[in-house]
């Protein structure tokens, strides 16, 4: 099974998806590329009304889910946010906690272990790291030791050596999957198709280890 953990398919919330027509196109492209499941991943901006964001997010997700046909990938709901010390004190954070999948962006710099533990304890296994590719191996080991998992951007997987570099973190359980956040263009899943063709069996083995 191939899962895109960072799908931008919610009109009104995702800049890369400005209409329901675009959402349908992206789902079709994803299925054509062999993606079995999409996790809709809008971004929550710290300091904005979290309750209002969640209400808009849920409405957008319901409208897109209503368009899903048998020939499209399965959908899940998620939310990504940039780490902020105040996130656990934000009004409505208990609603965010109910989201099936959460991604946190640390901005390339990890907070203290105490803050990381508080974040992990509150959100649990549903929370993963979205910017692990910007972190040092030492930071990745810190996060692994604290029970975090991560999603790697698909654009980071271009050659067999990239898979070889990832494998230790896949084996340790730190890397759980990938998404296409940095992929631009009309069809962000074209890179996935090219990667599958270029790497063949190596990419298939990686997907099996991730899933």
Where are these regions (language model features)?
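Acidic side chains
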Residues: 4, 14-18, 105, 176, ...
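Extended substrate/RNA-proximal surfaces in nucleic-acid metabolism proteins
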Residues: 50-150
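An N-terminally biased module of ancient metal coordination in phosphate/nucleic-acid-related enzymes
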Residues: 1-72, 141
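Charged catalytic cores and adjacent phosphate/nucleic-acid-binding surfaces used
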Residues: 135-211
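Active-site beta-loop-alpha junctions enriched in small/polar residues
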Residues: 8-10, 43, 78-84, 107-109, ...
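A conditional alpha-helix N-cap/helix-loop micro-motif detector
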Residues: 19-20, 112, 159
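Generic enzyme active-site microenvironment
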Residues: 4, 40, 78, 103, ...
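A structural alpha-helix within SAM-dependent methyltransferase catalytic domains
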Residues: 24-31, 120, 124, 144, ...
């Amino acid at each position: 099974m191939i899962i895109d953990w960072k799908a931008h398919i919610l009109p009104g919330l995702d800049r890369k998806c400005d209409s329901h027509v675009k959402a349908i196109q992206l789902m079709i492209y994803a299925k054509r590329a062999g993606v079995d499941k999409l996790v809709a991943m809008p971004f929550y901006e710290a300091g904005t009304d979290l309750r209002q964001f969640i209400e808009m997010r849920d409405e957008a997700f319901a409208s897109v889910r209503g368009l899903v046909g048998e020939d499209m990938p399965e959908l899940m709901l998620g939310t990504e946010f940039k780490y902020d010390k105040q996130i656990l004190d934000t009004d409505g954070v208990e609603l965010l906690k109910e989201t099936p999948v959460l991604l946190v962006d640390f901005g390339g710099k990890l907070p203290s272990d105490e803050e990381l533990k508080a974040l992990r304890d509150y959100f649990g296994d549903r929370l993963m790291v979205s910017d692990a590719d910007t972190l040092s191996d030492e930071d990745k080991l810190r996060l692994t030791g604290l029970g975090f998992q991560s999603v790697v951007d698909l654009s980071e997987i271009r050659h067999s050596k990239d898979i070889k570099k990832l494998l230790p973190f896949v084996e340790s359980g730190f890397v759980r999957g990938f998404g296409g956040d940095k992929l631009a263009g009309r069809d962000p899943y074209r890179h996935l198709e090219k990667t599958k063709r270029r790497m063949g069996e190596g990419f298939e083995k990686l997907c099996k280890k991730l899933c």
